[in-house]
A protein has these predicted regions:
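Acidic-and-aromatic substrate-binding clefts and catalytic sites of carbohydrate-active enzymes
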Residues: 83-84, 105-108
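Auxiliary, metal-adjacent structural segments of Zn-dependent hydrolase domains
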Residues: 7-10, 14-77, 126
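Post-HExxH zinc-binding segment in Zn-dependent metallohydrolases
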Residues: 107-126
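Active-site recognition of the HExxH zinc-binding catalytic motif
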Residues: 91-103
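Hydrophobic (often cysteine-bearing) scaffold residues that line and stabilize catalytic clefts
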Residues: 25, 86, 90, 110, ...
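Short pre-active-site segment immediately N-terminal to the catalytic Zn-binding motif
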Residues: 76-92
């Protein structure tokens, strides 16, 4: 499978997988965030993994959610079978992306800020 970071042009990844347009949109939002909301200079990259067949994920603190950013791995995990469809997936990716940016900036995690950012990205992207 082609990974988003393998693309030189920053375009959404065209992956043919069961004919799903959703696959392109999933990686498209990651590409969009990488291009328009990068981390501060000197920060590493974050990996985004979509967990097929999951409708929720347990975070390191034991709480359940649709996605989680794990700082020790610099990785975002997103449940792939979310209620609410595409908009919910985009908001979840953006929410966790914001937590990653907060981490990169040594800021405390702010749920309200992450939710506002998620809604903003959904409006921009859809």
């Amino acid at each position: 499978m082609v990974q988003p970071e393998d693309r030189e042009d920053g375009a959404a990844v065209d992956v043919i997988l069961k004919g799903k347009r959703q696959m392109k949109r999933k990686y498209g939002v990651v590409d969009y965030l990488r291009k328009h909301y990068p981390p501060p200079e000197g920060s590493g990259e974050v990996e985004v993994e979509f967990l097929e067949g999951y409708d929720s994920i347990e975070g390191p603190d034991g709480s359940m959610g649709f996605g989680v950013f794990v700082p020790t791995e610099e990785k975002i995990y997103i449940a792939d079978d979310l209620p609410g469809g595409e908009e919910s997936m985009i908001e979840t990716v953006a929410h966790e992306w914001k937590h990653w940016l907060q981490y990169c900036n040594d800021e405390a995690y702010d749920e309200e800020e992450a939710e506002d950012f998620a809604r903003q990205i959904a409006e921009e992207f859809l």
